[in-house]
């Protein structure tokens, strides 16, 4: 399991050495403008950032705070939501920023690895300076990566872990080999070098260099988010090895820079990458192969994380219900086609706009600083209410100070492409916020009826032979989980302008269980043979094509005598003599022009309904399309006010 943990949680942080020092050199104006103070300074900042942010904040503190073993910003919010409604805002913002940054991770990880082909002597005549070919190879890999998502990654998960273990071992070895040429770089373990460099004239980038330093910590949030997949113990067990490998690699690159800063061959080399240059040409072939694999694995981890986060947001009613597939036997392995398509298109758009890793990394990380800040706020709230108030204050002051420094430093990336991820963050935040607000308004007007109030009226309609049958069975799908009541919307639908008389009315809700192959149902008939409340529980691997299950339930009740036999004079598609025709009805809400609702509420509802229209239809989710379901639009009653009276003239 520890090996699997490597593949799941360390892919992102494991690709940071590919581009962190390259971005540093670009910001300093090249290797020729980088002296010993600059190299020791950046190494010190990187080491202490990994130590404080990744090790202390996430590994030592955050992982002790879990929600039934699950980590991540949404799981954390679910744990503390009772302490204030305002906590939804940082949780939404952090989740939106994490999803936005997921678009850049595949682009920067894979493109930086593919660009290593340009350093291979055998391919240099073809690849050198040929940015278009590098871009095309990157695009092909990314398209293939997204194309195979629907097949699941369970079978290759253990392979991922093995590859990442080899990758980190490789980072440690090549770093140590170069470090052995100049052990003096270990002086950078002293934090004074980092602080002095940050404010010295040796630092051409100024405080913006912290935006580059932050790249070395970009996988830290994934450690916490994926805790539920691999377990806290496995991360505790493997993290020391990971950190040592990262330190060796970064310090090895530092030693190489110190040994070659005055080498004229590198003075005017554009996009110089110390990671590949510190290796001999023969070793670079292995490095490129492993780095591409590591980039794919890092991308896979972020894609899987995006699926999980969207699924969690749906359960919090912050996002619409989307079609979810489970290619594997575990619920953690899920696939959401809409999310996959959006991520793929957005990643390709990033590649089209920024072209190479140098420009992508210039935009990378800005949104993730927002996620880390919001996670710090939520963690501080938990620690505060856990009775450790002094610890909460110290934690908040220390880590917000560091992360706001990262944020303001990364704001220098805004005009260089950071605007794209911030725009994406705001778009996702808008979806979450308006969906949540719209859902609150809908629930505020939702009413329910007790059996004593509705059964007598339904009985009269059931026995009223003057009204023709609308259908033998009318099935309403409802999201209400309670079995001992009936949604008022269903009652209104039945007694609309033309009452829907039936031999039986059905209110059906569908729940998804954690057991992959659950197939069970429960029924409440309220002491009647014409009104049934049904709850169907299906495993997450089971098809949610409802008609087949409804038909089986009706047959079971008919055989048990709870449902009278329904004979029909005309042939039916299913040729079942005991069950009459079935009509499905779905109720959608719509805002009335005269509804008394605030402008903000009206906008939230309008956006929610627009998103719902684009996100897909329950008709497709529940396999109802062949049955021609009736979709009813019911008004959303929100303290409606009487319209002004007309004057007769």
UniProtKB/Swiss-Prot annotation:
Locations listed in the record: Cell membrane
Key words, A-Z: Cell membrane, Ion transport, Membrane, Potassium, Potassium transport, Symport, Transmembrane, Transmembrane helix, Transport
GO CC, alphabetical: plasma membrane
Role according to the record: Transport of potassium into the cell. Likely operates as a K(+):H(+) symporter.
Membrane topology value: Multi-pass membrane protein
Family classification: Belongs to the HAK/KUP transporter (TC 2.A.72) family.
Protein name: Probable potassium transport system protein Kup
Transmembrane portions of the chain: 1-21, 42-62, 84-104, 126-146, 159-179, 195-215, 235-255, 286-306, 334-354, 364-384, 390-410, 414-434
InterPro entries named in the record: K+_transporter, K_trans_C, K_trans_N, Kup
GO terms for MF: potassium ion transmembrane transporter activity; symporter activity
The keyword Cell membrane belongs to this UniProt entry's keyword annotation: yes
Key word DNA repair present: no
Organism, scientific name: Bifidobacterium adolescentis (strain ATCC 15703 / DSM 20083 / NCTC 11814 / E194a)
